[in-house]
Amino acid sequence: MKRTFQPSRLVRKRRHGFRLRMSTKNGQKILARRRAKGRKRLSA
């Protein structure tokens, strides 16, 4: 059976990256929440 996690840096950046988050209203809400919480890393 194939494992579910097949790492790819490009796919990771494109799907969960900062620029994707900034590009949508809800993505910006996610970043705002993570900033408020004090996360060291805001996105992938």
From Swiss-Prot:
The protein's name: Large ribosomal subunit protein bL34
Record family assignment: Belongs to the bacterial ribosomal protein bL34 family.
UniProtKB keywords: Ribonucleoprotein, Ribosomal protein
GO terms under cellular component: ribonucleoprotein complex; ribosome
Start-end of Basic residues biased regions: 31-44
GO molecular function, one term: structural constituent of ribosome
Domain of life of the source: Bacteria
Positions of disulphide bridges: none
NCBIfam families, A to Z: rpmH_bact (TIGR01030)
Biological process terms in GO annotation: translation
UniProt keyword Ribonucleoprotein present: yes
Pfam assignment, any one: Ribosomal_L34
Region described as Disordered: spans on this chain: 25-44
